[in-house]
């Protein structure tokens, strides 16, 4: 569960290291982002040589959350950190690599992110 004003790590090589969530997209009543949800975020920490600079406002998709994500078979998955992958306007990832595992729940909507990830849980 990622709320507004939460901080999240960036799981790609776009140049950003940490972002702050400004808004959760998906309707005015949606207050919490789960795995696979798109958020609007501001880059808080970035590498000086990266494609993304600190202060930029971008869209990102949530790929890992600390909160349990329950699956239909009764099991759940939980990660060590909250992480996002930064997206371009057309919905493709900015980076060319995805670090760390990503959840299986994003397979249908974001196949490009799953293909870049080393591990899908």
From Swiss-Prot:
Keywords: Ribonucleoprotein, Ribosomal protein, RNA-binding, rRNA-binding. GO terms for cellular component: cytosolic large ribosomal subunit. One of its GO terms (biological process) is translation. One of its GO terms (molecular function) is structural constituent of ribosome. It comes from the Bacteria. PROSITE patterns: RIBOSOMAL_L14. Gene3D superfamilies: Ribosomal protein L14. Pfam families: Ribosomal_L14 (PF00238). The keyword Methyltransferase does not apply. Part of the 50S ribosomal subunit. Forms a cluster with proteins L3 and L19. In the 70S ribosome, L14 and L19 interact and together make contacts with the 16S rRNA in bridges B5 and B8. NCBIfam families: rplN_bact. Belongs to the universal ribosomal protein uL14 family. Binds to 23S rRNA. Forms part of two intersubunit bridges in the 70S ribosome. This is Large ribosomal subunit protein uL14.
């Amino acid at each position: 569960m990622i709320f507004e004003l939460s901080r999240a790590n960036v799981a790609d090589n776009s140049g950003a290291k940490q972002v702050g969530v400004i808004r959760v997209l998906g309707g005015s009543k949606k207050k919490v982002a789960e795995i696979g949800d798109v958020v609007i975020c501001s880059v808080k920490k970035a590498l000086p040589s990266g494609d993304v600079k600190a202060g930029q406002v971008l869209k990102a998709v949530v790929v890992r959350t600390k909160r349990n994500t329950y699956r239909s078979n009764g099991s759940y998955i939980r990660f060590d950190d909250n992480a996002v992958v930064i997206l371009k306007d057309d919905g493709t990832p900015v980076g060319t690599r995805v670090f760390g595992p990503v959840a299986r729940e994003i397979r249908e909507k974001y196949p490009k992110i799953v293909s870049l990830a080393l591990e899908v849980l």
